[in-house]
Swiss-Prot record:
It catalyses: (R)-S-lactoylglutathione = methylglyoxal + glutathione. GO terms for molecular function: dioxygenase activity; lactoylglutathione lyase activity; metal ion binding. It comes from the Eukaryota. The lineage of its organism: Eukaryota, Viridiplantae, Streptophyta, Embryophyta, Tracheophyta. Zn(2+) binds at residues 20, 71, 89, 137, 150, 201. This is Lactoylglutathione lyase GLX1. Binds 1 zinc ion per subunit. In the homodimer, two zinc ions are bound between subunits.
Length: 283
């Protein structure tokens, strides 16, 4: 067992970083326009793969070498998707929520919660929807190197999910928020402090153990120095907590980038990508 216990130390020693979140949209140009003009993101790169009948666009608030970005996927001929009940929201921090909300409104976006203090807290927030119906929480904060600050997913067992992301992915529980009066609990997971980088926000709603996944949200990609060793750790944690490997560690055909992909116990997908291969892709 010494080997397994040594292996389980690896995720904490590894050089991990959130790279991007992948999801599907019905009109790539429409979403690019909305994210650049409304949210102030930059279009970082775009690729069209006609033989596979899809296009990708990468957008973010800084370069992919340092920032967390979105990877939008457009599948030819598919104009809408089912977001499901499990996906929660993305979050963007801004120094002026009201101004950003006005910009959303001016560009035809849907404001679902007007700016105001968060329930039971002091932060000023708002909620808006993009053209595909993905929810974005807008949070008023001071300047930050990473304005794209959260991905929120709902889980059926928060303690199990926290344990999975700690053991399988080497994340830290940055903060736990209990809200019994609103019947939910949140765990903020990440690799760095919450106000400096992206966090994974796991939400447990009392008595809700299952959600629909839909076909819109795809996965989060995280960098690693060794996909093979990381894959072995995932297998050990899968046996203990649930989840499964969906693609064994190894190079992707055509690209050569080494990855391993897996589902967590709630069925959310993560892809670990070799750090050096990822940087090569950006050259």
């Amino acid at each position: 067992m010494a080997e397994a216990s040594d292996l389980l130390e690896w995720p904490k020693k590894d050089n991990r970083r959130f790279l991007h979140v992948v999801y599907r949209v019905g009109d790539l140009d429409r979403t690019i326009e909305f994210y650049t003009e409304v949210f102030g993101m930059k279009l970082l790169r775009k690729r069209d793969i006609p033989e596979e009948k899809y296009s990708n666009a990468f957008l973010g608030f800084g370069p992919e070498t340092s920032n967390f970005v979105v990877e939008l996927t457009y599948n030819y001929g598919v104009s809408s998707y089912d977001i499901g009940t499990g996906f929660g929201h993305f979050a963007i921090s801004t120094q002026d929520v009201s101004k950003l909300v006005e910009n959303v409104r001016a560009k035809g976006g849907n404001v679902t919660r007007e700016p105001g203090p968060v329930k039971g807290g002091g932060s000023v927030i708002a909620f808006v929807k993009d053209p595909d119906g993905y929810t974005f929480e807008l949070i008023q904060r001071g300047p930050t190197p990473e304005p794209f600050c959260q991905v929120m997913l709902r889980v059926g067992d928060l303690d199990r999910a926290i344990k999975f992301y700690e053991k399988a992915l080497g994340m830290r529980l940055l903060r736990k928020i209990e809200r019994p009066e609103y019947k939910y609990t949140i765990g903020m997971m990440g690799y760095a402090e919450e106000y400096e980088s992206i966090v994974l926000e796991l939400t447990y709603n009392y008595d809700v153990t299952e959600y629909t996944k839909g076909n819109a949200y795809a996965q989060i990609a995280i960098g690693t120095d060794d996909v093979y060793k990381s894959g072995e750790v995932i297998k050990i944690v899968n046996q203990e907590l649930g989840g499964k490997i969906t693609r064994e560690a190894g190079p992707l055909p055509g690209l050569g980038t080494k990855i391993v992909s897996f589902l967590d116990p709630d069925g959310w997908k993560t892809v670990l990508v070799d750090n050096k291969d990822f940087l090569k892709e950006l050259e």
